[in-house]
């Protein structure tokens, strides 16, 4: 992002929602930190990343009913753009095509690319979250997200067993 390696995944998504002022996310993050009596910097740890998975799940679960209501309302009103039955029939498929899909997987951004020739997959590629997070230094010699995370001063429970770094 703008020339810098960025971590992807639940913590990144929760922090983005928090920074954007998403009310439920701010409430959940603040109350979690308060209940655990932890400072904000605790988010950038194994505990913080685990908590982010849980908090993100709560935010998504809370939104699902509204999304379902909108979908059903649109279908009842005749808006069926989310489903095109004709495109589900193999006879309607082109002999050659290219496709790309992006989504947020539990560990972070996921991209899939496909090339179809003679109605068969000619090439398929997935760029998985670990590709983003574990990427090497870039052309400007900036560290990838994992390396950058290890450069900070981590407080270790036992300096002879730095498992926090491995888990985070």
What do the predicted segments below correspond to?
Residues 1-168:
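Metal/cofactor-centered catalytic core regions of large enzymes
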